[in-house]
Amino acid sequence: MDFIAAEDTRVTLKLLNRYDIKKQLISYHGHSTLNCAENIISRIKGGENAAVVTDAGMPCISDPGEELVRLCAESGINVKVVPGPSAVVSALAVSGLNTSRFAFEGFLSVNKKQRSDHLLSLKDETRTLIFYEAPHKLINTLNDFLKYFGDRRISLCRELTKVYEEVLRMTVSEAILYYENNNPKGEYVLVLEGAERRDISDGYTLETAVSYTHLTLPTIL
């Protein structure tokens, strides 16, 4: 490896110093321009090897790296992955909820319309749903969950793999009450129970049947 593209060079430098690793660090984060990524690609094409490191999680999973990997693929550059910590799978495993099928939704938008549309699209999703959330937005998000999804079971995973790791398992309404009396701290992974499965005949009412009576069926000779 010739250089390291880091989300925060200060954070990565502490890790490198801890293990006495001497490598050039360059900044590559969520606000980096396309020009920055193209510069990295250019250096790799010139014969150098690079690593991508993020501060607290797996690169590309709600962290920088996705665009860079895409550019590498388009340029025919081989990309190797070193499996690292992923809060998504860790939180799912410890949630106590269904782990066979799940959907990771990342951070919800702060735009009210986009946020509402996103949550509405998930209302009937039967898979376990996983979200990331910041502490100052937690109660608002829990209230939105109650509004759009009802009072489902939820696992609130805080500061996973860190000193103050905590996992709370309760219902959404219980979580709202808890955090109205306990100040949220740290980064959260929210694992929400999926919607109940409905039989395909559910909702096929007499009104539905009548609505089809005007249709003319084709005649087969």
Where are these regions (language model features)?
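Class I SAM-dependent methyltransferase SAM-binding "motif I" and its flanking Rossmann-like core
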Residues: 67-125
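Short hydrophobic/aromatic-enriched beta-strand-loop microsegments
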Residues: 22-30, 79-80, 100-106, 151-157
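Anionic-ligand binding region
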Residues: 116-118, 138-180
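Short glycine-rich anion-binding loops that position phosphate/pyrophosphate groups of nucleotides
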Residues: 55-59, 135-137, 195-197
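Class I S-adenosyl-L-methionine
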Residues: 1-80, 90
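A C-terminal functional module that forms or caps the active site or interfaces directly
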Residues: 169-211
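Single conserved hydrophobic/aromatic residue that forms the stacking wall/gate
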Residues: 214-221
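Generic beta-sheet signal
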Residues: 47-54, 102, 127-131, 188
